Amino acid sequence: MTTVKTNLLDLDRKGLRTYFAEELNEKAFRADQIMKWIYQFGCDDFDQMTNINKKLREKLKRVAEIRAPYVSQAQHSVDGTIKWAMRVGDQDVETVYIPDGDRATLCVSSQVGCALACTFCSTAQQGFNRNLRVSEIIGQVWRAAKEIGIEKDTGRRPITNVVMMGMGEPLLNMKNLIPALEIMLDDIGFGLSKRRVTVSTSGVVSGLDQMTGNIDVALAISLHAPTDELRSQIMPINDRFNIATFLESVSRYIEQSNANRGRVTVEYILLDHVNDDMEHARQLAVLLKDTPAKINLIPFNPYPGSPYRKPSNSRIDRFMKTLMEYDFTVTVRKTRGDDIDAACGQLVGDVIDRTKRTQVKQHDGEQIPVKTV
């Protein structure tokens, strides 16, 4: 009978120590040694772990494995951005490497597809398939680090930042998200600063409240409209958690967070003549007057079949200046990797079958109403 091996990438430090103690009858420091080999040296071969005795290495080869997603396709943009289709099981998710000056950001997926049906997002058109496991989330970071040259100088900047802004809604996969974040932050894992790991959410309040007091990372919120009426039209999640409820949850999280330095990043996609009028800017400023926020404007990136258009530069500029009149810090996101469909809202896995979503999807016990497409 074939033994089902434990994928060590599914375990954070606490889980790995428990596994070593209860399943292998080994001490905690051995688990820590293995964790360093995996994440700090990019090692997936027990035989190469030279400070581990041979008896333990042989035992690990029988019962455990280090199995990350593998790259099934890679596309390189002229601006240095790389998009990888990473194979998880029999499907692909997309992971994007974005170099920019002295930093390099990795955009990581949390689900295969997405159930939230945001009308401006190409990923949403796929529907939802499943949540990613811990090994499939953290494995994207592990594989990307290998691809850009963790063991040798490739001339590419190592990963300095991770953003959970790829395929899926992270807070609908809390069971697997939290351990993956713990590994990113762990000093014997990837050792990233909590200010350099960002979770973006479309407004799953139940998940955000679960994060509050349990994990401290930077927070970005996908707001995209200043009123409930408009937001519900383009983001059906608003029918479950309206703007006021969402912002109250954000305030609770920010109050206990050191990573956010007292303010949240508000993401606002600009859709031509939909949510980009000057009145929308004024409404947004009033809405956020009691929320310490940095506003990141995201000009829409068109994709085939989309009903929306990117606003003109003059409309983008007027919207930004209107917000700045209210003393907000406002940035306009640079479009990166759009020539390889890697820009925000364009993450579409070519090999994933396009399936119609049901009216209600179940995730981690949370029922979220969605619209069919």
UniProtKB/Swiss-Prot annotation:
> How does the cofactor attach, per the note?
Binds 1 [4Fe-4S] cluster. The cluster is coordinated with 3 cysteines and an exchangeable S-adenosyl-L-methionine.
Localization, UniProt: Cytoplasm
Keyword rRNA processing (UniProt): yes
One Gene Ontology CC term in the entry: cytoplasm
E.C. code: 2.1.1.192
Domain named Radical SAM core: which ranges? 100-339
| PANTHER family attached to this UniProt entry | 23S RRNA METHYLTRANSFERASE, RADICAL SAM CORE DOMAIN-CONTAINING PROTEIN
Annotated protein name in UniProt: Dual-specificity RNA methyltransferase RlmN
Which gene specifies this protein's sequence? rlmN
